[in-house]
Amino acid sequence: MGLLVGISMLYFAANDWTQENLGLSGFSIRGISAWALSGEPNSTVIMVAAIALFIASIGKSGQFPLHTWLPDAMAGPTPVSSLLHSSTMVVAGVFLVARLYPVFFVGLDILGSGGNLIMFIGAITIVISAALAFVQNDIKRVLAYSTVSQLGYMMLGLGAGAWLPAVFHIFTHAFFKACLFLGAGSISHSASHHSFDMKRDMGGLRKVMPITFTTWIISTLALCGVFPFSGFFSKDEIIDNVGNNGYNTFMIVGLVGAFMTAAYMTRATYLTFFGEPRGASAGHSSHESHGAHGSHDTHGTHGDHDAHASHDAHASHGPHESGLLITAPLMILSVLALGSGLLNATPFGESWERMKLWVEPRAVEVVDSTFPGGPGESLFINVPSAEEGS
């Protein structure tokens, strides 16, 4: 409903202006963004439209208070969760705000006050979701609440005017969160008999699953924003930009959220890979009973026993490393979780800011005589191609 109301308001408010001045439809993102920055919009209309669109974004990206649905959407296969919760479905709301940023920039007076709706919702989501992640025993629910918290960082950055770091965090988050979800799937497949309960069926897996463990640690460090992993160059950049733009209270919230992220991921890592094996990871499962049936088979029906052994190799071998089909994506994603931050390594200087050249929109000639200057002036025109940015 929020999306429908927001789109309708923008179309009817901007259509005449965009067609007259730019020859574009009122549904054109370029036209709407240009209209938002032109000084023409009625302040009430653009504010209500921005709020309506943001309500839609809250629902789509699982922000507070509509954050509870996302962890419940874990019933599907882990590769599906990996795609949907790292880089595709749930970031759509954040991308909507980023893509129509001039509407929010003007409508919610970003950088013009002590805070705005986007920042408040993002900050609340960061803390609440991190706290909920800390008390989960299901490893996929930990990662789901972690995703909600990271989406809160993206929203906080957009609300504070840190457009590029927020968009860059979408990029880096895709790699390390996908790796973490697939790591959880690897554990479920090869160690815990398809259980995701860390307390009941995991523990002590670091030695029997070295590849899964190593890739998990790399992605965890990226999620926690540890240098030189990719999260340092995106999430920490958001926190730094929030502080530099004068929102010190929100910067503190971001720092608290970073410590909470480290806390719940340390807990999840310890319960999964350290300590004594528990439950399925210790070899305790209903599959053990099949061995007894085999010992009572005195009539030479070895075919049934062989069929069962081939049917459930996991039970006979106990916890073990997953095959190449599972570990190869983990290794690829872990490399990207480590190195993708270098595409916009702001602390190293402007020559390292490649992502800025590729995705930051630029103004073209038409704006010179039509639009006033100011922050965000260039955000409505074409995104340059990689060739133009090279």
Could you tell me what each predicted segment is?
Residues M1-G349, S369, G373, S378-S390:
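...captures the hydrophobic TM-helix bundle architecture rather than a specific catalytic motif
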Residues G349-D368:
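Membrane-proximal cytoplasmic C-terminal regulatory module of class A 7TM GPCRs
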